[in-house]
Amino acid sequence: MADPGIVMVGIGDCAIARCPVKIKTSGLGSCVGVTIYDRHEKIGGLLHTMLPNIKKAGIKDNPTKFTDAGIEYLVAEIIENGGSRRKLEAKLVGGSSMFENSHMNIGERNIKSAKETLKKLGLEIIAEDTGKNYGRTIIFDTLTGDLLIKTMLRGDKVI
């Protein structure tokens, strides 16, 4: 049975919520999970993005599949729902290199795109857990801004 206090976010999607709701996504491998949070208003969002750049893909729909467009979309949604741009902070998780000989480096490119987009928007990354070679599940708490990171063999941690 699903927990009504937890909103699930699928791959290539995002959600925003207010305290006390939590937002969860699973399966962050080369994908990147980005949380944006206004600590004062207790509103935040989580984005689970697949690919680094919407312009290079030549696709106009579903911006949340793409790191750059997805972050811009998520920030706009949070502001539209009462968040203050000046008070927004970001956390970044994922971007793993899941396969040793991958020439595309999607994880690295997703991380780079996220950092560039957040910098362009003037948002500070206050914590991150990126790269490496393992998957992650994350649960974002809109009450505290904490981000619980769960892994199969490495245990859990909060950033």
From Swiss-Prot:
<keyword id="KW-0378">Hydrolase</keyword>
<keyword id="KW-0145">Chemotaxis</keyword>
<dbReference type="Pfam" id="PF03975">
    <property type="entry name" value="CheD"/>
</dbReference>
<dbReference type="InterPro" id="IPR011324">
    <property type="entry name" value="Cytotoxic_necrot_fac-like_cat"/>
</dbReference>
<dbReference type="InterPro" id="IPR038592">
    <property type="entry name" value="CheD-like_sf"/>
</dbReference>
<dbReference type="GO" id="GO:0006935">
    <property type="term" value="P:chemotaxis"/>
</dbReference>
<comment type="similarity">
    <text>Belongs to the CheD family.</text>
</comment>
<dbReference type="InterPro" id="IPR005659">
    <property type="entry name" value="Chemorcpt_Glu_NH3ase_CheD"/>
</dbReference>
<dbReference type="GO" id="GO:0050568">
    <property type="term" value="F:protein-glutamine glutaminase activity"/>
</dbReference>
<protein>
    <recommendedName>
        <fullName>Probable chemoreceptor glutamine deamidase CheD 1</fullName>
        <ecNumber>3.5.1.44</ecNumber>
    </recommendedName>
</protein>
<comment type="function">
    <text>Probably deamidates glutamine residues to glutamate on methyl-accepting chemotaxis receptors (MCPs), playing an important role in chemotaxis.</text>
</comment>
